[in-house]
């Protein structure tokens, strides 16, 4: 039942009626049963907004990617023979669930008040299908040499096979809805009857639409495009990293709610089928659709004219950048080829000169030849030294001037890791709530003014995580964080680094992202201007928060406090007084303690290593 709860709340579109207040109350109670957390009024308003935005009927699409704990054990393009031997048994368990899971993605809808009759009907149609069900495991394992099918091929075949059940399901759904219209209780008020009949009429019409060839072909085509787009995403390292991180964080979220699950099913995500197909038909480019899917999935958005346009611009910008890089590489190769040719000609001329000299001297080594040889060796030595000095100059230029080679070597050994300055707006959160409030009320950021001390204290918990800088400065940072695409705002180049984190307080755990916002200052240094933990339910419920992977931010006026940057070198709170850092192979944990009683743990933040792709 927990998986149905997850499907109903987290990953599917919902059919909801005008009884949105009751729906919020109903769903809120179910969430509170699954989590040790009660909803306050603000969270109920956020849930109400989320339900209104996601209301409607439609089928979902599968994300063709299989996780096992913190590893991707089967990617969109993985063939059975490519799977790690130790993971094959686990993957087979997941694949065995594929026909039912894909059927659920097509057939399941949420009906306000009582969806058990839809669930029962869905299960009945699946179990009593007149044709033989697909043996997905046998199909996936069937291979001749390297000709085994990919995971996306298996998903598409199974999906198309399941479509054969839609006629029967659609007919039964329409019939059941019509019967329930006739059975509407006479004890209901006229307004309640009207709402109930309207909801059931929508379900009836939806069931009838599932019987049409056009609707069935649309469903199949959308899943095929989704699979092709995921394969395209997987080919690019930068796209794959953000896609895997978002998928991994959602799996962690589901695992926390449904901890009793034996296997982790691939994600089902609602994406507008018609919008997806129209975007592909218009541009005939799987690259553009892949960019669109990546944006919609990682930024928790929807397909719209704006998102499609962003995807088109993103692909064109990338293609232009790749074209420029290609031209630059060709130019460098041509220059290198020319240098090599000139060097060969110079060496040939040398040999000819030596040969002529030997003939004139009759094979004797005269003082002139010795002098010429010494001059040649000196010239070669000078060329090598000039080359080395040039390398040192280029190396040192980035850190403020050339130095001797010996000193440069020491400098390089000392500067292993990453160097970041920290903006005043980040350091502010290390202060007391009263001082933070005073600074925010006087500051230029409108959204932070006039906050109560209670609000400041809550925000301090997720913003005062300066210890993360220890990880950011280390050589291990790239194992934990993904860098997003760069963008320009207010004349500065900005980007983000995003990691997966778990925030724990009072026995409650929250899965989310550790966000690091950076910009390039005038001295070409990297400055951290934003640092926080953002829970996934904050992104999902839309509490005025942007996606971690979203392009852009709402931070203005970085010049304020830019003169008070710190490189944070040597920064640590007194050990045992405020926090303790625990470093492990796959996790970086910060434990915050009560300054008055260090045996009391107030909260903790664990940054997890990026999901491993096997």
UniProtKB/Swiss-Prot annotation:
<feature type="compositionally biased region" description="Basic and acidic residues">
    <location>
        <begin position="372"/>
        <end position="381"/>
    </location>
</feature>
<dbReference type="Pfam" id="PF12376">
    <property type="entry name" value="DUF3654"/>
</dbReference>
<comment type="similarity">
    <text>Belongs to the UPF0329 family.</text>
</comment>
<protein>
    <recommendedName>
        <fullName>UPF0329 protein ECU03_0090</fullName>
    </recommendedName>
</protein>
<feature type="compositionally biased region" description="Basic and acidic residues">
    <location>
        <begin position="345"/>
        <end position="354"/>
    </location>
</feature>
<dbReference type="Pfam" id="PF07753">
    <property type="entry name" value="DUF1609"/>
</dbReference>
<feature type="compositionally biased region" description="Basic residues">
    <location>
        <begin position="408"/>
        <end position="420"/>
    </location>
</feature>
<feature type="region of interest" description="Disordered">
    <location>
        <begin position="317"/>
        <end position="420"/>
    </location>
</feature>
<feature type="compositionally biased region" description="Basic residues">
    <location>
        <begin position="355"/>
        <end position="364"/>
    </location>
</feature>
<feature type="compositionally biased region" description="Basic and acidic residues">
    <location>
        <begin position="317"/>
        <end position="338"/>
    </location>
</feature>
<dbReference type="InterPro" id="IPR022115">
    <property type="entry name" value="DUF3654"/>
</dbReference>
<feature type="compositionally biased region" description="Acidic residues">
    <location>
        <begin position="382"/>
        <end position="394"/>
    </location>
</feature>
<dbReference type="InterPro" id="IPR011667">
    <property type="entry name" value="UPF0329"/>
</dbReference>
